[in-house]
């Protein structure tokens, strides 16, 4: 028996043992077991969308491994304890096409099995990242039998006919082979994990799109580009016209809201002939007006929309093949447009950036979440753009420093995020990792966060150390958070978060750091608001365990909550009003 088969059987036996235990504990017609055995899925809760695992909503406190880490179980072995110490509950890890199908039709899942076993041994969950045809706008993770056969698996062509190092999404054989491999992976996950649910979600491809060109100029792509826009896309746009993102709606309107036509007739001009895309990290020379048009909008719109549709159709076929085997939630991620590379082709053209999210929703209904890898300074703006059109917020790549810790807390509280994940956890994992301390507090209040998602009783702010106060309205109160640091104390991070949960009339749970929090009446300016009781404490198994009762100097001017600069903490406050 080879190691792969032995590993598979061991995992299968463990899964069956787990199921037997659940049934034994829930003997009434196996009802509890049936609930638990439903695969992870997305489910609406009020205005929020939640990830449901084993019958309960699950908040992903994630981190992504470096791209090559999961290619070696020996490399991972000493890393697992550090991941646990980082207070994660989920690890995002690569599964690459080249390693599971080194020869066409021969699959090897021993790395996948080892990854699952490692996660289980450390009480962690997994989000699998399928690196198939694309990674970061290039094609480097497919098997050699794909790379070496460009006649069967063609590459994107530049305007002058040069081959780019990325597979074209117009290659039928590429799509079929990718989908077949992905289906085999999902079938294997169902066989070894369909009852344990170690794997929560799957990312399909990675940051796909064309770099160094705004679109594919190959023969197949050019034929499609010169033809009509597919009726299914036009029908979708017409049916959702009033709900389209404004970038796309305004563009379509400006071009006459045509119900049919060629790509350029419907969506406007593409890249001017002969315009050369420079190195991807630099923007072409632009006037100020051109830059403002490109930034946060659609520049050379038809090229990006055309490629978005084709990538979406390709990815949808791959996702459908996988979901037919095991219907885990699936998402796609993207490299975002940025100020210093704002034209399509200086970032991957055709990926699910916010301005083309409706194209992706039309073309890839098998994908449940469109996600941005948010490293840009405009974090709040990007999150707001991704929660449009019913899209849930999941952040698969971002920062893991103090700023990232604040972003995670804010995303959970402000936008009902399903999860947050910094990239490259290998380098920094451990209890002293900035995000670890924030995740510890998030873990404590996760039951509250999940309970209050989608019902308007939770919000959050981001406060800059030298910035203005931030104010929100919640539960009949105006809440103002001001940056604060005691003289002689530690220097606070440049940005912190405050999370506010309304527990009922005049009662709040607040998470914060390096800030003072003030409450005032949101309905009657003549009313004063007093602090009835203030407790610091922790949550243990969902129950509040009070520590100190705060008063005096710990409540500045007897009217504010004070959060120390050293770390995030939790306070529980009851308020009263007086004239």
Provide a role label for each language-model segment.
Residues 14-26:
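Bacterial N-terminal signal peptides
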Residues 33-89:
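N-terminal carbohydrate-binding accessory modules
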Residues 70-84, 348-363:
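Short, acidic/polar
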Residues 75-149, 311-325:
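Aromatic-lined substrate-binding rim segments of carbohydrate-active enzymes
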Residues 121, 135-341, 362, 366, ...:
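Active-site region of glycoside hydrolase catalytic domains
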Residues 315-328, 354-451:
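Catalytic-core region of carbohydrate-active enzymes that cleave or remodel glycosidic bonds
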Residues 409-526:
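Aromatic- and carboxylate-lined catalytic core of secreted/periplasmic carbohydrate-active enzymes
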Residues 488-491, 507-579:
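C-terminal beta-sandwich/jelly-roll accessory domains of carbohydrate-active enzymes
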